[in-house]
Amino acid sequence: MELNQVKEQLLKLQSRLSAYAHAMESISYDGQTVAPKGTAENRAHALAVLSEEEYLIKTGSETVALLELLDNNKAVLTEEEKRMVHLMLKDIRRMQSIPMDEYIAYQELVVKAEDVWEDAKKNNDFASFAPYLSEIFETNIKFAKYCAPDKAPYDYWLGEYEDGLTMEVCDEFFAKLRERIVPLIKHISASEQVDSSFLKGNFPVAKQEELSYYLMKLMGLDLAHCGLSTSEHPFTTSLGSHLDERITTHYMEDDFASSMYSVIHESGHALYDTGVDDKYLYTLLDAGVSMGIHESQSRFYENLLGRSKEFVAFVLPKLKELFPSLKDVTAEALYRAINRVEPSFIRTEADEVTYCLHVLVRYELEKKLMAGEIKVTELPEHWNKLYKEYLGVDVPNDKLGVLQDSHWAGGAIGYFPSYALGSAYGAQLLSKMAAEIDVKDALSKGDFSKINDWNREHIWKHGSLYRSDELLEKALGEKFSADDYIDYLEKKFKEIYK
């Protein structure tokens, strides 16, 4: 077979696998949104069958031979083809390390765990979820040892979400954040507090939904390729390619800001996914490169833009139109209220200053669980202890504590540090962007076009072509540093809390 034919086979293989991904992601999305409660067993069965097919395709001798032939002829491959081969071989070697029956059983476990978690959260019943979560952590430890026996299991999974990330890197990063953020929190606590009482009230879900679509359109999302639904925990997913994007939110009638910022956050993810260059359609490059870069985009739009003085002032007339109780609220009052700093229980509703401490709690617990230092049954106790130590709050129940996030139920062990890293990436990207375009002026006009064009050119269009560190360095012209993020927090919040 000629090399051009081999390259064509590579594209066909990726296209076929993207169709399997579409089917499996659709089943998962359905389960977290509109699927009836009694369908978990059926969905688990379907995912098990599809997972077996996917496993056999990826680990089959024909696929392995194809990839090894291409890998041995790297000199004649394009940059894109080399990256496709690298990513596929990495995935295949991971799968080859895990016995097929265990891989399939894990896919079934996650479907059931997500279903049980949703009920457990609603009923404040951690005990019913604990056996599933124990099995998820045990399986992740086992799989990590299969795939990288010379690595600590947690280091392996951290690196799967963010290339090169380790506990050592995380420890250094979080230590730097705490060094400057803890004094900032003390400064804020000693200052006059901000009134945010008007953010609570009666905000009909229908009006909040109208606001959601307004925000998605305002941010530049193509609604022909991006849908909105509701779920217990907001999330974003691509169904097989960047042509089919789904985001979800969770409405609370007494709090419009919760869903408003969830929608802005998830829309940031969706802009990244749908912004990948069309030439990568149905290939492994048709996705964001890492969860850290993904969170840099979601938290960039949610906080750096969405909580800015300029954006808040622009969107206020729309809020007053939808919610009459806000008719006397000024732009300055709303800006201060939206940025109120107050230690709380819920990560997704945390302010920008204390947010990284929520992530740190999860990181510390994952580290201990993956090292076998604590048991899942002890998790609520350790969770509540760290929340008291880091945020000074007494967690009243598990629904507002250890059960609040869906990530562990979905098997996403090692994901959480990406949120804090993404926030820091985003601040550095904003510094670079603001040196080239007038971001504040654009936001004051509600015009995201130049902002999106910059992100598309520097981040989105590249998909998974580059490693995350390479992508950042190309976009920034320098290596990553957390300094811009901490400087941003200090400047912004010392102006609000004088």
List each model region and its residues.
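C-terminal, non-catalytic "cap/extension" segments appended to globular domains
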Residues: 2-6, 25, 38, 42, ...
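Post-HExxH zinc-binding segment in Zn-dependent metallohydrolases
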Residues: 287-328
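Active-site recognition of the HExxH zinc-binding catalytic motif
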Residues: 148, 258-277, 295-299
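All-alpha helical catalytic cores of prenyl diphosphate-utilizing isoprenoid enzymes
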Residues: 174, 178, 205-209, 215, ...
